[in-house]
Structures are given as structure tokens and as C-alpha cells.
């Protein structure tokens, strides 16, 4: 009788990957990144163990969306006070905080709870081409 394999946290190795997001579509990048942060691309994937890799995304300022979404896609946040809701569209979000739209998209695709919060911490997003993770020797990942 064979038993189902269950990965142990000590046995999992987390690799580093770098993705160039220049002229890539937001949703397609986000879904691939979420899959790799969870570790579903690995044979040792276990739902309750963090088996995912570290992902560094560069050039997030050049990320794009299709159609009329630069103006029509709206992000909401609320201060907690009555009437304290603010809305920002994708174009303004990219101009002010490049990469935040990608972070929000990926975060929505990850599980909610302690494991999901640990997974989102492995995502590093930078608007430009430079990143401070060269010491980890990230491998280039083509999407």
C-alpha cells in the first residue's frame, strides 16, 4: 500500500526567479506568479505547506492592460470614516505606485490566511530594471 506524499517545511527549497514585466499583460503575469508563489508547478506541492519560490518582478511600470482598462479599471480603498472611499484607475495607480496593481492582482489569487500572507511576502516588485536581490542569483523566468 502506498501513502500519499506530504512535503515537510524543512525539505522544501525555495528558488529565486526574476521576471521582466515589460509589455506583459497584467492578468497573465499575475496568474503565473500566483501559481509559482504557491508552488503548484512543483511535483512536491502540498496545499498546507509553503512550497513556492521567491519571485522578483522588474519593470513593473511597463506592465499593460488590454482594451479600455487603463481608464475603466478602478481600485477602491476606504479610510474607515464615513464618506472616506477613494477610487483610483489603473493609469493613475501605475503613475503613482508602479507595481502596486500587480501586487493587488497576485494577492487576490492567493489563499487568505497565514499561509497566503507568507506567500505574498515572497513577491518582490520593482518599477525599474534594478533590484537589490542579485546576491540570491535569481534565474530569469520567461513568460
UniProtKB/Swiss-Prot annotation:
Organism this protein belongs to: Variovorax paradoxus (strain S110)
What subunit structure does UniProt give?
A: Part of the 50S ribosomal subunit.
Record-linked SUPFAM superfamilies: Ribosomal protein L13
- What is the designated name of this protein? Large ribosomal subunit protein uL13
The terms describing its cellular component in GO are: cytosolic large ribosomal subunit
Family statement? Belongs to the universal ribosomal protein uL13 family.
Q: Does the keyword Ribosomal protein apply?
A: yes
| Keywords for the protein's UniProt record, in alphabetical order | Ribonucleoprotein, Ribosomal protein
- Keyword Ribosomal protein in the entry? The reply is yes
Highest rank taxon of the organism: Bacteria
MF GO annotations: mRNA binding; structural constituent of ribosome
Query: What are the recorded Gene Ontology BP terms?
Result: negative regulation of translation; translation
Pfam families hit by this protein? Ribosomal_L13
Positions of disulphide bridges: none
Role:
This protein is one of the early assembly proteins of the 50S ribosomal subunit, although it is not seen to bind rRNA by itself. It is important during the early stages of 50S assembly.
Amino acid at each position: 500500500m502506498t501513502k500519499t506524499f506530504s512535503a515537510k517545511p524543512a525539505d522544501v527549497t525555495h528558488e529565486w526567479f526574476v521576471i521582466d514585466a515589460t509589455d506583459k499583460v497584467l492578468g497573465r503575469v499575475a496568474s503565473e506568479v500566483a501559481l509559482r508563489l504557491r508552488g503548484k508547478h512543483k511535483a512536491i506541492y502540498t496545499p498546507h505547506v509553503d512550497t513556492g519560490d521567491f519571485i522578483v518582478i522588474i519593470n513593473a511600470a511597463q506592465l499593460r492592460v488590454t482594451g479600455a482598462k487603463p481608464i475603466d479599471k478602478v481600485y477602491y480603498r476606504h479610510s474607515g470614516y464615513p464618506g472616506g472611499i477613494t477610487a483610483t484607475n489603473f493609469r493613475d495607480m501605475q503613475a503613482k505606485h508602479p507595481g502596486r496593481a500587480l501586487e493587488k492582482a497576485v494577492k487576490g489569487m492567493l489563499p487568505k490566511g497565514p499561509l497566503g500572507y507568507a506567500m505574498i511576502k515572497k513577491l518582490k516588485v520593482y518599477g525599474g530594471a534594478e533590484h537589490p536581490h542579485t546576491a540570491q542569483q535569481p534565474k530569469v523566468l520567461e513568460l
